[in-house]
């Protein structure tokens, strides 16, 4: 349960989260200190992962573990997207549990070298920012213009049993993207999407969160650009992957096996 929700950008927000005990009919605060973001239960419902001050934390309702410690505003972000990713790929959570809740993988954004852009803030009316009644304020954030450097991205995972953090080896261009990391039905796999900066070449990888090794499953190359809904609406099952694609000029569904072999186009039309 969350309260005191405050918007950050278009899709992101911070809030205070509480765990509700149905039997005891009581609330317990998820975490003290700064507000939290994207609190998400593990698939086995034993833990909650969330982001606070650009770092990932995991709680079992009683004990809290800080998974990352290098998060810093306008420098390093763990588990939530930077401004570019949130706008370009329409999501606000950049971590995923594995299928049985024993591991969590995330995208790390190093935006320390990205140039800063500043905006003036005024009092306004919805909501009213009274602190800017007499003089405007200023908000500065990392905003790469076209052709400028984006955040440097990397993939990591945390083993809840051992407490070990490892790097996940999923190839991507130096200026490319990881537009999504998703849960897979297989506990030894997370699904990672990569895309080049032109956004006309997308690839799906299965990566083992315990070893860091990855395998390419699907490559989707199109003349113009891969639409965001292709990333958002693809489904990874136990035996098949269902991928939307407009490769023939119209959006259709394509069925693949888990080795990335195309089985068939599911439906047709225009």
How should these model regions be labeled?
Residues 1-11, 47-55, 60, 93-96, ...:
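Beta-strand C-termini and the immediately following turn/loop, strongest in propeller blades
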Residues 16-18, 55-57, 154-156, 203-205, ...:
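A short loop-to-beta-strand structural motif that recurs across blades of beta-propeller domains
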Residues 21-25, 60-63, 159-163, 208-212, ...:
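Short loop/turn segments that connect beta-strands within beta-propeller blades
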Residues 28-31, 64-77, 166-169, 214-219, ...:
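Beta-propeller fold detector
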Residues 74-90, 173-178, 223-230, 270:
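Short glycine-/Asp-/Thr-/Trp-enriched loop segments that recur within the blades
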């Amino acid at each position: 349960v969350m309260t005191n929700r405050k918007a950050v950008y278009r899709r992101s927000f911070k809030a205070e989260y509480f765990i509700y005990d149905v039997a005891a009919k009581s609330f317990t605060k998820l975490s003290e200190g700064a507000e939290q973001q994207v609190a998400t239960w593990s698939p086995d419902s034993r833990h909650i992962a969330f982001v606070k001050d650009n770092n990932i934390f995991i709680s079992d309702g009683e004990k809290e573990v800080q998974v990352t410690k290098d998060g810093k505003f306008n420098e390093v972000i763990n588990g939530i997207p930077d401004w570019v990713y949130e706008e370009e790929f329409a999501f606000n959570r950049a971590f995923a549990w594995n299928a049985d809740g024993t591991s969590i993988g995330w995208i790390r954004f190093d935006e320390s070298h990205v140039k800063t852009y500043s905006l003036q803030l005024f009092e306004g009316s919805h909501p009213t920012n009274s602190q800017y009644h007499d003089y405007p304020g200023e908000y500065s954030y990392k905003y790469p213009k076209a052709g400028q450097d984006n955040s440097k991205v990397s993939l990591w995972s945390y083993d809840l049993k051992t407490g070990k953090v490892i790097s996940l080896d999923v190839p991507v261009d130096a200026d490319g993207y990881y537009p999504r990391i998703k849960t897979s039905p297989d506990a030894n796999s997370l699904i990672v999407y990569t895309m080049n900066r032109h956004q006309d070449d997308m690839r799906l990888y299965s990566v083992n969160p315990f070893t860091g090794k990855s395998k390419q499953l699907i490559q989707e190359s199109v003349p113009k650009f891969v639409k965001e809904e292709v990333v958002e609406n693809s489904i990874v099952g136990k035996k098949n992957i269902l991928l939307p694609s407009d490769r023939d000029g119209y959006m259709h569904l394509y069925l693949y096996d888990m080795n990335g072999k195309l089985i068939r186009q599911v439906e047709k039309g225009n």
